[in-house]
């Protein structure tokens, strides 16, 4: 079973809640996503999410608040294949309003450029399906 760790990085600005999201700069068809990555063999999912936030967004000083949810999801393209998903809450107080970052690390997205921005609570429905499944636990 593939294991995935998702990062819900939140902030409050002018009394409004938002979650960090990104688009693939050169592939708009990929939709709006939150940072996530595959848990390596023997790796703790909490360490995965911190690593992925650093590699995908350059936010190497993001602070992990905790695990929000864990589930198992069958993949629509192959129902026999499932993902164990871990959703974590993090904060990154010094993150800019918008920026681009070239992905680092050993994953298949190495070298891609992601355009980051803060997605307000009222636009959470714009996230790629499955990415916002547990945001209701922290953004009200």
Indicate residue ranges for each PLM-predicted region.
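N-terminal strand-loop-strand
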Residues: 1-34
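Non-catalytic surface loops within mature trypsin-like serine protease
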Residues: 11, 61, 90-94, 120-123
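Active-site-adjacent beta-strand/loop module that shapes the phosphate/pyrophosphate-binding cleft
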Residues: 72-104, 117, 137-139
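Short hydrophobic/aromatic beta-strand or adjacent loop that forms the aromatic wall/cage
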Residues: 2-6, 83-87, 113
